[in-house]
């Protein structure tokens, strides 16, 4: 019987979740969807001092925005403490763990001596019970840690889906602390129990976890489990070549939403940030799931390129439905001081978006460029003096008169402009610039006929005539 694929995303809610973090959700999500398996969300919140509910919310919000739906969870490690203690008790009863009374100061001194002797700093097994070995007397009033009896010989090995065969000698691994003096279990132990209980078949995570893997495999086998398939993803670097982090200026996942990026663009970009399908650059979420495999995960660090993401976002904006973009733009209008009432009274927002979206790389840019349709223009005196000259004023008056009666279409408006230019022997910029300035408040707009059509007859004629009084 074939085992159903079960993957997981297991973030620690200790702050900021950036693109490098969320990629470790995207790939296991895609693999689970491709294999018709199960995607599990687990919140590893055992670092009580640093874990916050705000960080959990940011994780859930970021995943929801990108459409990374999970089938089971979220499971919280702090809510599973009874289960961890149960397994610890089983391990104690089986002789798989032992109490260690070595103090932090003693351990630090031991490691310093080892470093001075040119040895690898590691716990030396002072309190590890062995046949015929006499252990020190436990110090009074000291609560011990619990250490896992790591095998002393042999190797722990796995075939990593990204890095290939990895073998670590057990002699290199000391006996890991799996429970603190107060009885709370440690990270590596909780991870193993969770992966075992949740029947995880594939662990796709960052390669900063490679060093944890041999320890986790040994604990897993001691508990009677078999290791999952591991795929350790190379680091995501920022544009300066440093590991992506908040400290080095990374933006949060929802920060991209708040900057006007579309989720489909971010998913497409993230998919290519460490995986490839031939030369394909642009593909839908459905294509990504269909194509995704572990064999084509990159083996080298991937470097973030903001310009590439902006280019992808511009592509998806061009493809997006105008009504959807109009809704997404509303919060950005609010930031510009333009409320829903102003939007309702002004030009049709979906039509405005349709005119402007080909020039924008973010939804925020669309709102900024569209603001002129929902504000009263306030051109400065210098611009008015430069463009609304005595030479052009008669042409403006004739144009306003013509626009009162023409059919209100782009073609009819263009014809009225052309006729006015011919009658007054003007070039297009001589007329279009002042018209733009008086109607929109700026000399920089898309094609003048399209802009005037969206402003509407009453607004266009009224603003031109007001300037001529």
UniProtKB/Swiss-Prot annotation:
Enzyme class, broadest EC rank: ligase
SUPFAM superfamilies in alphabetical order: An anticodon-binding domain of class I aminoacyl-tRNA synthetases, Nucleotidylyl transferase
Pfam families attached to this UniProt entry: Anticodon_2 (PF19269), tRNA-synt_1c (PF00749)
Catalytic reaction list: tRNA(Glu) + L-glutamate + ATP = L-glutamyl-tRNA(Glu) + AMP + diphosphate
Positions that bind ATP: 246
Entry function: Catalyzes the attachment of glutamate to tRNA(Glu) in a two-step reaction: glutamate is first activated by ATP to form Glu-AMP and then transferred to the acceptor end of tRNA(Glu).
HAMAP family: Glu_tRNA_synth_type1
This protein's name: Glutamate--tRNA ligase
Taxonomic source organism: Paraburkholderia phytofirmans (strain DSM 17436 / LMG 22146 / PsJN)
Lineage: Bacteria, Pseudomonadati, Pseudomonadota, Betaproteobacteria, Burkholderiales
Name of the gene: gltX
């Amino acid at each position: 019987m074939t085992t159903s694929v079960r993957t997981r995303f297991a973030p620690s809610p200790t702050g900021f979740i950036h693109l490098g973090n969320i990629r470790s959700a995207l790939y296991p999500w895609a693999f689970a969807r491709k294999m018709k398996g199960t995607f599990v969300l687990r919140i590893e919140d055992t670092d009580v001092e640093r874990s916050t509910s705000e960080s959990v919310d940011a994780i859930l919000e970021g995943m929801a925005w990108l459409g990374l739906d999970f089938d089971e969870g979220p499971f919280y490690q702090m809510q599973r403490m009874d289960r961890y203690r149960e397994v610890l008790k089983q391990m104690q009863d089986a002789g798989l763990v032992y109490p260690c009374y070595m103090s932090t100061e003693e351990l630090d001194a031991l490691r310093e001596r080892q470093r001075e002797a040119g040895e690898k700093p590691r716990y030396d097994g002072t309190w590890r019970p062995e046949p015929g070995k006499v252990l020190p007397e436990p110090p009074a009033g000291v609560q011990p840690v619990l250490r896992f009896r790591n095998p002393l010989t042999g190797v722990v090995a796995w075939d990593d889906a990204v890095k290939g065969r990895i073998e670590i000698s057990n002699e290199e691994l000391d006996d890991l602390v799996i429970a603190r003096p107060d009885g709370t279990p440690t990270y590596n132990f909780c991870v193993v129990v969770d992966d075992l209980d949740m029947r995880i078949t594939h662990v796709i995570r960052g390669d900063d976890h490679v060093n944890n893997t041999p320890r986790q495999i040994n604990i897993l086998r001691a508990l009677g489990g078999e290791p999952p398939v591991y795929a350790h993803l190379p680091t995501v670097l920022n544009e300066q070549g440093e590991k992506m982090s908040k400290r080095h200026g990374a933006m949060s996942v929802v920060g991209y939403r708040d900057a006007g990026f579309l989720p489909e663009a971010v998913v497409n970009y993230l998919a290519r940030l460490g995986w490839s399908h031939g030369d394909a650059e642009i593909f839908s979420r459905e294509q990504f799931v269909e194509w995704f495999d572990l064999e084509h995960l990159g083996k080298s660090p991937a470097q973030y390129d903001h310009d590439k993401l902006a280019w992808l976002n511009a592509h998806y904006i061009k493809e997006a439905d105008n009504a959807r973009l109009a809704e997404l733009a509303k919060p950005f209008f609010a930031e510009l001081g333009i409320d829903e009432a102003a939007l309702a009274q002004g030009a049709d927002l979906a039509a405005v978006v349709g005119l402007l979206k080909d020039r924008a790389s973010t939804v925020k840019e669309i709102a900024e460029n569209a603001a002129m349709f929902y504000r009263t223009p306030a051109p400065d005196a210098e611009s008015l003096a430069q463009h609304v000259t005595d030479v052009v004023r008669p042409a403006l008056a004739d144009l306003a008169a013509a626009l009162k009666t023409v059919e209100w279409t782009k073609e009819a408006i263009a014809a009225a402009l052309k006729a006015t230019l011919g009658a007054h022997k003007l070039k297009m910029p001589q007329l279009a610039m002042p018209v733009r300035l008086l109607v929109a408040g700026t000399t920089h707009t898309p094609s003048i006929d399209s802009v005037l059509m969206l402003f509407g007859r009453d607004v266009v004629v009224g603003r031109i005539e007001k300037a001529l009084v």
